[in-house]
């Protein structure tokens, strides 16, 4: 006579068992579509920008192949790239892509910051200069101090601010080095 296996009964009331997280099929499809779109953004990058993104060898080969393909073959390759993304952590890739895409915004923000610092230097003088040189010790204190005084005189006399532009250029070189 054959032995019967005892059926394992799942106790829904037992809190010691692992919590099961159910994911809907629609959510899985949305995630897959997001990864496919991420792959498409990466495929559309130039080679120089592509080198800035941390990709493993198989993924890089798949992306380079997708850049050469057209129409339906490209669509299938993008599906494959999305599948490869499902097996890895994509956060470092997304962060690198965001840096590349937002480079213009970052530069604009930095230029606005430089302009704000320049305005503070002309308004507050030596106090603002000391704060600036604490943050950026490579700055030329004497030259900046002379330019600040010249800019303040030009401002008082309502002359075109040649010294202000020179301060701006010095700060741009100083702050964009970092």
Swiss-Prot record:
Gene3D superfamilies: PSPTO4464-like domains. Its main location: cytoplasm. One of its GO terms (molecular function) is rRNA binding. Pfam families: DarP. GO terms for biological process: assembly of large subunit precursor of preribosome. Keywords: Cytoplasm, Ribosome biogenesis, RNA-binding, rRNA-binding. The keyword Membrane does not apply. It is found in: Cytoplasm. Transmembrane segments: none annotated. InterPro entries: DarP, DarP_sf. GO terms for cellular component: cytosol. Belongs to the DarP family. Member of a network of 50S ribosomal subunit biogenesis factors which assembles along the 30S-50S interface, preventing incorrect 23S rRNA structures from forming. Promotes peptidyl transferase center (PTC) maturation. PANTHER family: UPF0307 PROTEIN YJGA (PTHR38101:SF1). This is Dual-action ribosomal maturation protein DarP. The lineage of its organism: Bacteria, Pseudomonadati, Pseudomonadota, Gammaproteobacteria, Pasteurellales.
């Amino acid at each position: 006579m054959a032995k019967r296996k005892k059926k394992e009964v799942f106790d829904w009331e037992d809190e010691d068992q692992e919590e099961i997280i159910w994911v809907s099929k629609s959510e899985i499809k949305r995630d897959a579509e997001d990864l496919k779109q991420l792959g498409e953004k990466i495929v559309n990058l130039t080679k120089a920008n592509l080198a800035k993104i941390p990709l493993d060898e198989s993924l890089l080969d798949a992306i380079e192949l997708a850049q050469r393909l057209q129409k339906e073959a490209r669509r299938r390759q993008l599906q494959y790239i999305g599948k490869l993304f499902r097996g890895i952590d994509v956060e470092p890739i997304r962060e690198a892509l965001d840096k590349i895409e937002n480079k213009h915004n970052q530069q604009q923000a930095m230029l606005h910051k430089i302009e704000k610092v320049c305005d503070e230097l002309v308004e507050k003088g030596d106090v603002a200069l000391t704060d600036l040189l604490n943050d950026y010790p490579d700055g030329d204190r004497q030259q900046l101090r002379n330019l600040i005084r010249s800019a303040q005189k030009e401002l008082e006399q309502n002359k075109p601010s040649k010294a202000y532009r020179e301060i701006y250029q010095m700060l741009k070189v100083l702050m964009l080095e970092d």
